[in-house]
């Protein structure tokens, strides 16, 4: 990958408590918030963005007199490609950087490209469950494959990339580590993702929540690497924390953390009741249940797998509770019936 200056440079702006933020656009989802700290010997980052965003990250750092080589520490909230895939090439441009992540993540992921191919297949399996119309299914799978090929091609074009995910310092739940000039505490916060952690600066009460909560909403990938049960547990755990600032990886800072976390828990309950109510009226499939609960707008902007995964996680919970049964068709398509 040739690292060049983009046409529009995202600013590296200070947002209080000696925290900086860079908003990196990406081709398939909402822009990523990269949080930074200026230390005596360089920079500490929380997440580093999509592989294609490296030039924008470099250009933004340059506006404050820094370069990629000034990056000394990178803390990863989790291993989704819009947060961590840039690390596959940053190892060459920031050779002294130390990478931090959840202990199980490195061994669990291994070859990052191979792990993303499994993720791609899981996405297609979810589409197969949801779309009963073969023509519509083929169209959505073709679009999905095109997006994934674009990602793989970005790595193939670089001569400095390494597909093996590297974690130098493994993190466990409730670890406290001095990184750069600050003391961080880490909370293991699964639900959105199996390896998700939340870095905390206890001195300021700043919690960097990754993808746990995005603009009062949630993202659970269900069949891929998320868990509705874990997510409920994580939200309850966060409600016990002395959170003063909740800084997500997408969107604006959460203004009222406790109220928002409580609202997300209530929203999940409302969605569950909505699924039951609609199945009382008639059997339905995943696509129609998702559109009734969230709306058709999610078909645009890369949100479709997230929305389907969220509703499917609710359906599986209700199946385990004996409230719903699944009618499986030969092609993988599923229709859901309310028991009784």
Task: Say what each PLM segment does.
Residues 84, 231, 235, 311:
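Aromatic/hydrophobic pocket-lining residues that form the small-molecule binding cavity
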Residues 8-64, 197-212:
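Conserved beta-strand hairpin/beta-sheet module of binuclear metal-dependent hydrolase folds
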Residues 77-83, 102, 192, 250, ...:
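Histidine-centered divalent metal-coordination motifs
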Residues 1, 277-340:
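C-terminal regulatory/interaction regions
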Residues 53, 62-169, 173-177:
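Active-site HxH/HxHxD metal-binding segment of metal-dependent hydrolases
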Residues 31, 108-113, 217-221:
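Short, charged, surface-exposed secondary-structure boundary motifs
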Residues 8-14, 18, 34-39, 50-55, ...:
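A structural signal for the main folded, soluble domain(s) of proteins
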Residues 43, 50-52, 149, 158-162, ...:
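Metallo-beta-lactamase
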């Amino acid at each position: 990958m040739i690292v060049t200056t983009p046409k529009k440079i995202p600013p590296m702006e200070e947002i209080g408590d000696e925290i900086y933020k860079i908003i990196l656009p990406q081709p398939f989802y909402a822009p990523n918030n990269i949080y930074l700290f200026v230390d005596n010997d360089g920079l500490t980052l929380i997440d580093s963005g999509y592989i294609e965003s490296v030039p924008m990250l470099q250009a933004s750092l340059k506006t404050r007199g820094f370069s990629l080589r000034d990056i000394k520490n990178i803390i990863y909230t989790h291993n989704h490609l819009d947060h961590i895939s840039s690390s596959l090439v940053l190892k060459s441009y920031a050779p002294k950087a130390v990478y931090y992540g959840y202990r199980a993540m490195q061994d669990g992921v291994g070859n990052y490209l191979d792990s993303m191919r499994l993720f791609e297949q899981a996405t297609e399996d979810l589409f197969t469950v949801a779309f009963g119309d073969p023509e519509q299914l083929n169209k959505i799978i073709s679009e999905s494959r095109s997006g994934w090929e674009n990602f793989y091609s970005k790595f193939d074009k670089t001569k400095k990339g390494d597909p093996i995910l590297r974690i130098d310092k493994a993190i466990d739940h409730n670890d406290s580590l001095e990184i750069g000039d600050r003391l961080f505490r880490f909370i293991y916060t699964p639900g959105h993702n199996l390896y998700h952690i939340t870095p905390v600066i206890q001195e300021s009460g700043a919690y960097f929540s990754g993808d746990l909560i995005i603009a009062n909403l949630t993202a659970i990938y269900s069949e891929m690497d998320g868990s509705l049960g874990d997510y409920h547990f994580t939200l309850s755990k966060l409600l016990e924390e002395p959170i003063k600032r909740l800084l997500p990886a997408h969107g604006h800072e959460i203004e009222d953390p406790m109220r928002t976390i409580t609202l997300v828990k209530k929203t999940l309950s409302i969605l569950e009741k909505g699924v039951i109510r609609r199945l009382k009226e008639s059997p339905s499939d995943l696509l129609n249940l998702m559109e009734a609960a969230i709306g058709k707008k999610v078909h645009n902007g890369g949100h479709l797998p997230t929305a389907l995964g969220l509703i499917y996680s609710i359906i599986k919970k209700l199946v385990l509770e004996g409230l719903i049964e699944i009618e499986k068709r030969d092609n993988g398509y599923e229709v859901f019936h309310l028991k009784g």
